[in-house]
Amino acid sequence: MTKPNPNKQSVELNRTSLYWGLLLIFVLAVLFSNYFFN
């Protein structure tokens, strides 16, 4: 299980999870705003 550059891979993984977290927060914000404004 040796990879050429494990540090780069972990950074890519963290960035991807960060984007998913921001997307989830955005979706929740839209749902809550729709709930409160209706």
Curated annotation (Swiss-Prot):
It is a single-pass membrane protein. Keywords: Chloroplast, Membrane, Photosynthesis, Photosystem II, Plastid, Reaction center, Thylakoid, Transmembrane, Transmembrane helix. It is found in: Plastid, Chloroplast thylakoid membrane. The chain crosses the membrane at residues 17-37. GO terms for biological process: photosynthesis. Its main location: plastid. GO terms for cellular component: chloroplast thylakoid membrane; photosystem II reaction center. InterPro entries: PSII_PsbL, PSII_PsbL_sf. Pfam families: PsbL. Belongs to the PsbL family. PSII is composed of 1 copy each of membrane proteins PsbA, PsbB, PsbC, PsbD, PsbE, PsbF, PsbH, PsbI, PsbJ, PsbK, PsbL, PsbM, PsbT, PsbX, PsbY, PsbZ, Psb30/Ycf12, at least 3 peripheral proteins of the oxygen-evolving complex and a large number of cofactors. It forms dimeric complexes. One of the components of the core complex of photosystem II (PSII). PSII is a light-driven water:plastoquinone oxidoreductase that uses light energy to abstract electrons from H(2)O, generating O(2) and a proton gradient subsequently used for ATP formation. It consists of a core antenna complex that captures photons, and an electron transfer chain that converts photonic excitation into a charge separation. This subunit is found at the monomer-monomer interface and is required for correct PSII assembly and/or dimerization. This is Photosystem II reaction center protein L. It comes from Huperzia lucidula.
